[in-house]
Amino acid sequence: MPIIIDKDLPARKVLQEENIFVMTKERAETQDIRALKIAILNLMPTKQETEAQLLRLIGNTPLQLDVHLLHMESHLSRNVAQEHLTSFYKTFRDIENEKFDGLIITGAPVETLSFEEVDYWEELKRIMEYSKTNVTSTLHICWGAQAGLYHHYGVPKYPLKEKIFGVFEHEVREQHVKLLQGFDELFFAPHSRHTEVRESDIREVKELTLLANSEEAGVHLVIGQEGRQVFALGHSEYSCDTLKQEYERDRQKGLNIDVPKNYFKHNNPNEKPLVRWRSHGNLLFSNWLNYYVYQETPYVL
């Protein structure tokens, strides 16, 4: 089934070229189907790339989704044209009286700041509070996961001596959890972080369950409130070349950045990346949508 997006959204062309089934809002209105309402709070500066990454994954399920893109009203985005935001995005104020089946909160390149130093922190707190009663399930990614764990449960983040950067092996820690349905016991996921949350802090919160972690990269998947809140510290949504682009960008800035681990063939940045996370990335998003959104949401929101 398709994802419903604006016919002029640039990501639409990318998805159609990859045979991802997309549908315009105009066509969807002619069908007698109650599509799932999914909001994506896009905190990334690379808005269009993030749109394509997430839409690619949530569009790869049998469910019909009506996608709403959100940006922060209290933050000025400098890396995306204002016309793009005006045309395709809403703010929290626009939708705060609505209910949603699912919400995705992305990462953001602000992790070296304390949460309270982030210029849109107060607005984000209001959105996270709103999600507790107006969203069936919320998926938090990377910094968004750190923010959610901190706001909802008081779980702190800690600076790392070296950036966790690359593709890492993870182990499933809880069997028979629907979010991990179909997962191998060992699976890969990308990480790109300067900070971490610690397993010991997660285990001190009785409402949280650690689902998967990595010896090298630490905590990856955590679930809370019977699936109403899902936290992914890694980036299973990343495209094949995302880590490569981050690596090359930082080198051009003159930063001392290591080659992303377990990513390039023969660990040689002149060779192509090896994608080892795509199947489990698709499983993660499809399981979230099926078991924690579709199966749990009421027909009338």
From Swiss-Prot:
Binding site for substrate: 163, 192, 249
GO terms under biological process: L-methionine biosynthetic process from homoserine via O-succinyl-L-homoserine and cystathionine
Compartments, as annotated in UniProt: Cytoplasm
Pathway involvement of the protein, from the record: Amino-acid biosynthesis; L-methionine biosynthesis via de novo pathway; O-acetyl-L-homoserine from L-homoserine: step 1/1
Top-level lineage group: Bacteria
Enzyme Commission number(s) from the entry: 2.3.1.31
GO cellular component, one term: cytoplasm
InterPro entries, A to Z: Class_I_gatase-like (IPR029062), HST_MetA (IPR005697), MetA_family (IPR033752)
Active site: 142, 235, 237
GO molecular function, one term: homoserine O-acetyltransferase activity
Swiss-Prot/TrEMBL site (Important for substrate specificity) positions: 192
Cysteine pairs bridged by disulfides in the record: none
Reactions this protein catalyses: L-homoserine + acetyl-CoA = O-acetyl-L-homoserine + CoA
Keyword list, A-Z: Acyltransferase, Amino-acid biosynthesis, Cytoplasm, Methionine biosynthesis, Transferase
Enzyme class: transferase
Main location group: cytoplasm
Family named by the database record: Belongs to the MetA family.
NCBIfam families documented for this protein: metA
HAMAP family attached to this UniProt entry: MetA_acyltransf
Role of this protein: Transfers an acetyl group from acetyl-CoA to L-homoserine, forming acetyl-L-homoserine.
Name of protein: Homoserine O-acetyltransferase
Organism: Bacillus cereus (strain AH187)
Gene this protein is translated from: metAA
